[in-house]
């Protein structure tokens, strides 16, 4: 974390993946390092030099859970100032590549990784604002639509709103 002259943290860009399985469960991880140590979240982390947003999201999900995913649309952009950190986080909808191999294994800076039903979300101490992001993403995705901004030219660098009819 970089600190500016006035002792405020420089914003860091991060990514996270909202991943559902065939049983309509969400992939959650429990952080074992600050910020949000002990809280449940979705897999994610900071970009590394030279990475695209999509590459970073795929890498973070793999590093933290062992699962391979295909990163789809942007479903949320959140800003968090917590425990001396300042993050701007881009949340993506991500789909499992190998649905037969969907058992998450906690790795990296994660103490636990598991599939959780939406009905059980209230039983988990989630990071701020996450429950609403999960539920909104699920409602749109379950309705047969891919939520959020989409990748215009399939390069993982330019995302726009889908076409909308303003009648």
Question: What are the roles of these predicted feature ranges?
Answer:
Residues 1-16:
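Acidic, metal-coordinating catalytic segment for phosphate/diphosphate chemistry
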Residues 4, 75-81:
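Short, solvent-exposed loop/turn elements at beta->coil junctions and helix N-caps
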Residues 13, 18, 32, 39-54, ...:
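Long, hydrophobic N-terminal alpha-helical segment
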Residues 17, 74, 92-94:
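A structural signal for short, well-ordered beta-strand segments
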Residues 25-26:
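Hydrophobic "anchor" residues
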Residues 35-38, 83:
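A conserved beta-turn-beta hairpin within the catalytic core of GNAT-like acetyltransferases
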Residues 47-70, 80-133, 162-167:
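Unchanged
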Residues 138-167:
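Charged phosphate-binding loop/patch that engages nucleotide di/tri-phosphates or the phosphate backbone
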